[in-house]
């Protein structure tokens, strides 16, 4: 009986879910040739399962590379912004744009 437990577990994990799904469709649709229908269903389910495994096992460096490039460009953008704020030429622009920094010019206008 010890051999039946691993066999039962294998069937319950690998075969039963797909077979039950096919049997439900078979009972619902009642095709003219049920065995041919069920056989084709199982073949199709196996093909779909193989495609899913291939998709999951594919390496994804093409998708990760743009993300890495985008992450690398973020500090460069931050450095550019920081450089523009620390540039002495931009300081007068921020001072003149503030109404409280030069009240005499605002009242004359």
UniProtKB/Swiss-Prot annotation:
One GO location term (cellular component): cytosol
For this protein, the record's CDD domains field holds: DD_DPY30_SDC1
Q: Locations of Low complexity compositional bias?
A: 88-101
Any GO BP annotation? transcription initiation-coupled chromatin remodeling
Disulphide bonds annotated for this chain are none
Q: Which InterPro entries match?
A: Dpy-30_motif (IPR007858), DPY30_SDC1_DD (IPR049629)
Q: Does the keyword Nucleus apply?
A: yes
Q: Which UniProt keywords apply?
A: Nucleus
Localisation: Nucleus
Q: Where is this region: Disordered?
A: 49-109
| UniProt feature, compositional bias: Polar residues | 73-87
Q: How does it assemble?
A: Component of the COMPASS (Set1C) complex composed of ash2, sdc1, set1, shg1, spp1, swd1, swd2 and swd3. Component of the Lid2 complex composed of ash2, jmj3, lid2, sdc1 and snt2.
Protein's job: The COMPASS (Set1C) complex specifically mono-, di- and trimethylates histone H3 to form H3K4me1/2/3, which subsequently activates gene expression by regulating transcription elongation and plays a role in telomere length maintenance.
Similarity remark: Belongs to the dpy-30 family.
Provide the protein name.
Set1 complex component sdc1
């Amino acid at each position: 009986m010890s051999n039946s437990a691993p066999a039962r577990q294998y069937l319950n994990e690998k075969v039963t879910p797909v077979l039950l799904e096919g049997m439900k469709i078979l009972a619902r649709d009642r095709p003219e040739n049920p065995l041919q229908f069920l056989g084709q269903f199982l073949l199709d389910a196996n093909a779909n399962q193989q495609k899913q495994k291939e998709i999951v096992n594919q390496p994804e460096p093409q998708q990760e590379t743009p993300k890495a490039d985008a992450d690398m460009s973020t500090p460069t953008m931050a450095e550019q912004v920081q450089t523009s704020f620390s540039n002495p030429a931009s300081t007068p622009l921020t001072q003149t744009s503030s109404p409280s920094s030069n009240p005499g010019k605002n009242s004359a206008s």
